[in-house]
Swiss-Prot record:
Protein name: Anhydro-N-acetylmuramic acid kinase
Source species: Neisseria gonorrhoeae (strain ATCC 700825 / FA 1090)
Amino acids binding ATP: 13-20
Family affiliation: Belongs to the anhydro-N-acetylmuramic acid kinase family.
UniProt EC number: 2.7.1.170
Any Gene Ontology biological process: amino sugar metabolic process
Keywords assigned: ATP-binding, Carbohydrate metabolism, Kinase, Nucleotide-binding, Transferase
Pfam families documented for this protein: AnmK
GO molecular function, one term: kinase activity
Domain of life: Bacteria
Length: 367
């Protein structure tokens, strides 16, 4: 009987707060469970350099390659800490799946750029490494995002009722899992990204811990209405978005400068919640259960806003109730995608991305 296999997934999302690594056990293409986690925060200097690369600037090619190497060293450190915590050696791991750090997402031009020096990562970890997951989907005409609906479908589908899985990272995205039909999903809009950027600009803090700042503000109805009028929200899915559309400078075009900073932050929380609620209402009107993962679940103000927007129509839960820690879900997805690559299983959620066909995602690098 063939032994089960261990995989590592590494994810660093649009919040740019650091890298998560998750250890996953598989039996071929069958999920058995997640067994460990490690997190390495980004140093402020690295985060600033990554944010600078979001905008057009000088010597971008050189800067991107140097940052790819720096990120891969940080990813390797995170993987090493995970292995140490589990008393494992690199030879115990079948493959490592690494998403990389998104710095540009332009599906309308057929590309999405995630920084990672994958051959270097394979060399440093001494683990077969799979990465560049989005390019194959884009080549098949897809958005290259979101990639997690197929993973959510494999783990979280219920044969009796439609479930929605909400991931609140920098960008928020949903996976809709109808019984007896293919999963689909899309980016609903900003998740934590605008709230984080506003907090960094006005309090010099990386994020609003526990929603403490937002809790001191009041919702500004006129500002909220203007933000909700953005044409992205009325576009049909499949669709995806990022900092290119919803950056701090976009928000500032709607401000007159006299707003209370706490009120703006409070409004941004409701903005995220309302866009999620509107998206679910249009795409999954029959859903009664929503399972939440990602960093946003730790913000009680945002969670209260979601509960108020949905009312009694949809009950809100953590993915922990489905046996996967909400902070582990995205990294675990890339371990699962690495297992799909190894086992030659298409892992692309083409109904979510709009690709013309299911694809085996990623490229592999031996050490």
């Amino acid at each position: 009987m063939m032994e089960t296999q261990l995989y590592i997934g590494i994810m660093s999302g649009t919040s740019m707060d650091g890298a998560d690594a998750v250890l996953v056990r598989m039996d071929g293409g069958k999920w058995l469970g997640a067994e460990g986690h490690a997190f390495t925060p980004y140093p402020d200097r690295l985060r600033r350099k990554l944010l600078d690369l979001q905008d057009t600037g000088t010597d971008e090619l050189h800067r991107s390659r140097m940052l790819s190497q720096e990120l891969s060293r940080l990813y390797a450190q995170t993987a090493a800490e995970l292995l140490c915590s589990q008393n494992l050696a690199p030879c115990d791991i079948t493959a490592l799946g690494c998403h990389g750090q998104t710095v540009r997402h332009a599906p309308e031009h057929g590309y999405s750029i995630q920084l990672a020096d994958l051959p270097l990562l394979a060399e440093l970890t001494r683990i077969f490494t799979v990465g560049d997951f989005r390019s194959r989907d884009l080549a098949a005409g897809g958005q290259g995002a979101p990639l997690v609906p197929a993973f959510h479908e494999a783990l979280f589908r219920d044969d009796r009722e439609t479930r929605v899985v909400l991931n609140i990272g920098g960008i928020a995205n949903i996976s809709v899992l109808p019984p007896g039909a293919p999963a689909f999903g899309f980016d609903t809009g900003p998740g934590n990204m605008l709230m984080d950027a506003w907090t960094q600009a006005h309090w010099q803090l990386p994020y609003d811990k526990n929603g403490a700042k937002a809790a001191q503000g009041n919702i500004l109805p006129q500002l909220l209405g203007r933000l909700l009028a953005h044409p992205y929200f009325s576009q049909p899915h499949p669709k995806s978005t990022g900092r290119e559309l919803f950056a701090l400078n976009w928000l500032e075009t709607y401000l007159d400068g006299g707003e209370n900073r706490y009120d703006v932050l409070r409004t941004l929380s409701r903005f995220t919640a309302q866009t999620v609620c509107d998206a679910v209402s249009h795409a999954a009107a029959d859903a009664r259960q929503m399972y939440i993962c990602g960093g946003g679940i730790r913000n009680p103000v945002l969670m209260a806003d979601l509960a108020e927007c949905f009312g009694t129509r949809v009950s809100l839960h953590s993915t922990a109730e489905l046996n996967l820690d909400p902070q582990w879900v995205e990294a675990a997805a890339f371990a699962w995608l690495a297992a799909c690559w190894i086992n030659r299983i298409p892992g692309s959620p083409h109904k979510a991305t709009g690709a013309s066909k299911p694809c085996i995602l990623g490229a592999g690098y031996y050490y």
